[in-house]
Every structure is written in structure tokens, then in C-alpha cells.
């Protein structure tokens, strides 16, 4: 645990929208909004803490991606792409921090069917109905994610746990 005059120890990045639809629907406005929130939100969050973390040679960034950032599924090409970005960005942040000796720990979460407000951001009726059915059958509560975040935080300063896929045991993907 960090003590003393450290101004900022952790940054948790958890903003995202999922207005998923088939590519043929050409919802380019939704695409731009996903990039603005799902990618630029992470960039801006890290930019806000990186100077402090670098100066104090300590810190931890925890970001929420999605299983869609690990696996492709119809209707989520752009959403999945924004979540793949989070994976890539966090891994490069971890590598560069190690190379520069700044001791910034990173953790990326890949939630599956977790009951949150995210489903309310789906813009395509067919995609929304399918995801609602999936979540009704398999969804689990957000406290499962909170437990994983606590685990990542509780690790000693010299230990980095980088990636967690979290989902219902009954969910097939």
C-alpha cells in the first residue's frame, strides 16, 4: 500500500456505451459516439493521472473492457473494436511503465453478462432483444466485478495482475 504524500494512487476507468447493430445498419453516428466514450474516455482518464503516477513512480490504472474485446460477435464490430483498443492500450501502458521504471500497475476487466445499465445503450431493436434475453438467462450482479477489482487492488506494490475475464458460469461465450 502506498503512503505519504502520494496525490493519487488509483484510477478506475469504467465508462462505456454499446449501441450495437449490424454493420449493414450503417449507424455511423453511434460508431463515433462509441469511439468518443469507449476509447477517448480511457485516453483522457489515463492522461489525467499519468503525470502524477510517473512523478511519484507508483499508481494503478484499472480499466473495464468487455468480452467483446476478446471475442467477435455479430452486431458488435465497432463496440468490440473499441474494447479491443482498451486491451491494447492497457497492455502497452503496463509494458512502457515497466521499461521506464515508473511502477504503474494495470488491470483490465473483461465482463460478460453483468447486470448494469449498459444494455440500455443498445440502439438496434433486434440486437437489444437478443442481449436482453441473454442477460435475463445468464446475467450476474456487479458485485462479482467489485470482488475482482478488490483483488487487483490488494496485491502488493511489486505485483501486477493484468487481465480478468469475469462472467456467469452458465454463459456459453
Predicted regions located by residue number:
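Short, small-residue-biased leader/transition segments that mark boundaries at the very start
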Residues: 2-9
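A short helix-coil junction within the Rossmann-fold of NAD(P)-dependent oxidoreductases
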Residues: 48-57
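Substrate-binding pocket helix/loop in short-chain dehydrogenase/reductase
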Residues: 22-23, 30-33
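Active-site helix of classical SDR
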Residues: 46, 82
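Residue(s) in the substrate-gating loop at a strand-loop-helix junction
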Residues: 66
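C-terminal helical subdomain
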Residues: 104, 108-109, 127-173
